[in-house]
Amino acid sequence: MNFPNGKTVKKVREMYPAGCRIVLDHMDDPYTKIPEGTQGTVRDVDDTGTVIPSWDGGGSLGIVYGEDSCHKIHTEAEAKTTLDWYGKYQPEADSRCPRCGERMPGPKGRHAISRWADITVCDQCGTIEALEKAGLTKTLPMMEWFCIRQAQNGGGEWKG
């Protein structure tokens, strides 16, 4: 196996910053139990260019540069899967709205449930989503939600 040079490793680190969400395309390991299409959160890229994720289903088997492949989430379906996953781990109180990034004071149950994903959003975004659902305003693509944009562009892992 040939290891990538420092310039290549730097490029991989820029492509997959810590916190970004990825989808496994292929893993050339006959012993892995991680199915293609599984999503995870990038933790690091090591000095050999291996992308180290935390897979949503558990585990942290790395994606070896030149052997395996993955991509950052880039479709609405992939964004919805990520938002649904984030919703399972959303803080119970005083979190941030995943759609606009504003603080949501108080308990999670006091705010709106998104009409597009299984996650809680702030009251204002809940109202906007109701208008979107009624066809009265243009729908904001899930790839444009604050929590997706921030994580995909090097802002670190979304923690709500």
What is each residue range found by the language model?
Residues 2-13, 17-76:
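Basic/aromatic-rich interaction segments and small domains that mediate binding to polyanionic partners
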Residues 36, 91, 116:
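Exposed loop/turn and edge beta-strand positions of beta-sandwich/beta-sheet ligand-binding modules
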Residues 76-93, 133-160:
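Short, intrinsically disordered terminal segments enriched in charged and Pro/Gly residues
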Residues 94-95, 119:
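Residues immediately within or flanking Cys/His clusters that coordinate Zn2+
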Residues 97-100, 122-125:
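Short cysteine-rich clusters marking metal-coordination/redox-active sites
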Residues 105-107, 131-132:
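Short, non-ligating residues that shape and space the ligands of small metal-coordination modules
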Residues 108-119:
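Short linker/helix segments within small regulatory modules
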Residues 123-133:
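Short Cys/His-centered divalent metal-binding micro-motifs
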